[in-house]
């Protein structure tokens, strides 16, 4: 008895699964693979800053090349308990040659915008008395007339004047004084009182 093996396209035959696998492979090969484009994240756009018309005025109060702003410090030493005197701020300020004989002569106009008056005590703890001081914003007074404001000689103290108090809002000709501070002590002539330390801020314009 012989055995016959039939190879054909009979449904349910042995070759049917292989043909399906080949067809499946062909379909996969014919499929178009999608291409994914990956782009790097872009740089954030920079917003252009708008320049204001008064940018220079925000940077500095005085236009470059037309004016200047300076600070000066000077002292009045060896004050006794009964010393008296005055500071005249402007071309008459002999206690500050760097201002009077220096930069003030290089400009036509100036204005002192602040004054810091400090009394530094050098007195002993047993000393007594005080130093009265007065602001004259228009240089009309030649001697102390008010004793309301005082520095206690053993303690010292400080007083700040802003522009509106010292006639420092408007510009002044460099040949005229702006304001004056007068002072007078009521202590003993034999007692050492201390010294004044004065700081002024000055704006200048219209160079010569």
Swiss-Prot record:
An MF annotation (GO) of this entry? structural molecule activity
Q: Where is the composition biased (Basic residues)?
A: 17-30, 44-61
User: Per the record, which residues fall in region Disordered?
Assistant: 1-69
* Protein origin, superkingdom: Viruses
Where in or outside the cell? Virion
Supply the alphabetized keyword list: Capsid protein, T=3 icosahedral capsid protein, Virion
Task: State if Glycosyltransferase is listed as a keyword.
Answer: no
Q: Biased-composition ranges for Low complexity?
A: 1-16
Iron as UniProt keyword: no
- Per the similarity annotation, which family is this? Belongs to the luteoviruses capsid protein family.
Listed name of the protein: Major capsid protein
Q: Which organism does this sequence originate in?
A: Potato leafroll virus (strain Potato/Netherlands/Wageningen/1989)
